[in-house]
């Protein structure tokens, strides 16, 4: 596979990829944490940590198989686990502290206490055999858009007392405060690893509660000293800032669970068109190239279920990619389409006997506008010595 050529594809689209979430969408790290150098870049990584990665901000409906497929496309994996919520009580808190700080973990079964069959908690771990593959995974997949999430891929930090218990719980926040403003408030005290603002699952309105994880515990302690009991701009009352995972606080387990178990969040993606509202007449004109239809406004994609519109599958917009080389795998499709928007899944069709690509594959994207832009940009694109043919999947398209 020509990785240099694929990296050039990403670099030409960097303005779309590198912005990162900076609003209160709570679907990924802010640009501050997104652009922080990895331990490999700073020379801070140890031998044990050069193959072990932590992946944050994964879609909650992502499966273990999809998780393995995505990272397995980079190189051979020793172990790969998507963390799920089949955890209760102190066991959750202790395991969470170990996982979040990158402590060397032992692979468990899917039915184990950490990796149960419950809903994904939005993060996981990948341990490669070759350190070069781990580095390649960071360079390739960090910042990739998956559905409404922008994933963060980094080295799992070695366990040490200085980085444990650095997660803060913040309450009393103004309902209008964004994730970016929350980070600006706390960033004066140290490097922020992740941040969250909890929102109502139905209305999408902030609950006035957030979480800040610092790089080191001492930074979190300084933030508590400086901000606990203070009134930030726009606040009607003083905010409360305290450690979220202090074992002496009985509420910490519930707070951590609340942080990672909010299903079906309705966050707009930061790197794609915010409006999901579009006109059906424009859609049909682009799809069929025929006369203008009567204007019908559609809000979201659910109204299109059952309609015979090319590419629409009920879960997204399926794109047919033809003339791939025999050596192509899923990572090629991830890298080609990821910069254009939220990708649900990719599939390369392989020959049963040789396991080589049969020359075509499929990509499903969440948003129509992003799918249409990807098609317009990549149809006719030269990849290596081949010219790609990219279009919405139709009934006549090769079956997968």
From Swiss-Prot:
Residues 12-48 are annotated as: Disordered. This is ELAV-like protein 4. Residues 51-158, 166-246, 317-395 form the RRM domain. Keywords: Cell projection, Cytoplasm, Developmental protein, Repeat, Ribonucleoprotein, RNA-binding. Belongs to the RRM elav family. It comes from the Eukaryota. InterPro entries: ELAD_HU_SF, HuD_RRM3, Hud_Sxl_RNA, Nucleotide-bd_a/b_plait_sf, RBD_domain_sf, RRM_dom.
């Amino acid at each position: 596979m020509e990785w240099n050529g694929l990296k050039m594809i990403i670099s030409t689209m960097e303005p779309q990829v590198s912005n990162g979430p900076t609003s209160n969408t709570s679907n990924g790290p802010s640009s501050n944490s997104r652009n922080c150098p990895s331990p490999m870049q700073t020379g801070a990584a140890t031998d044990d940590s050069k193959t072990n990665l932590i992946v944050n901000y994964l879609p909650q409906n992502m499966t273990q198989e999809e998780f393995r497929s995505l990272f397995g496309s980079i190189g051979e994996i020793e172990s790969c686990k998507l963390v799920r919520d089949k955890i209760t009580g102190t066991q959750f808190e202790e395991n969470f502290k170990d996982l979040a700080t990158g402590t060397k973990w032992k692979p468990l079964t899917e039915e184990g206490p950490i990796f149960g069959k419950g809903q994904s908690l939005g993060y996981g771990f990948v341990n490669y055999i070759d350190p070069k593959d781990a580095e390649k995974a960071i360079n390739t997949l960090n910042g990739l858009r998956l559905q409404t999430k922008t994933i963060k891929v980094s080295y799992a930090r070695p366990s040490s007392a200085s980085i444990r218990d650095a997660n803060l719980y913040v309450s009393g926040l103004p309902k209008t405060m964004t994730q970016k403003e929350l980070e600006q408030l706390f960033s004066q005290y140290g490097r922020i690893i992740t941040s969250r603002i909890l929102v109502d699952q139905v209305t999408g309105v902030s609950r006035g509660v957030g979480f800040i994880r610092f790089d080191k515990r001492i930074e979190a302690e300084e933030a508590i000293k400086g901000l606990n009991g203070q009134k930030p701009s726009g606040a009607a009352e003083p905010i409360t800032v305290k450690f979220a995972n202090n074992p002496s606080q009985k509420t910490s387990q519930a707070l951590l669970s609340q942080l990672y178990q909010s299903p079906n969040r309705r966050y707009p993606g930061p790197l794609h068109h915010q409006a999901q509202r579009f006109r059906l007449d424009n859609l049909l004109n682009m799809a069929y190239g025929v006369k203008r239809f009567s204007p019908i406004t559609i809000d979201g994609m659910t109204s299109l279920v059952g309609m015979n519109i090319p590419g629409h599958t009920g879960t997204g917009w399926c794109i047919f990619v033809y003339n791939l080389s025999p050596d192509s795998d899923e990572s090629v499709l991830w890298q080609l389409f990821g910069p254009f928007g939220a990708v649900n899944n990719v599939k390369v069709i392989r020959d049963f006997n040789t396991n080589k690509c049969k020359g075509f594959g499929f990509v499903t994207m969440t948003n129509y506008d992003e799918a249409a832009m990807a098609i317009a940009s990549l149809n006719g694109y030269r990849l290596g010595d081949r010219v790609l043919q990219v279009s919405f999947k139709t009934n006549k398209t090769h079956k997968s």
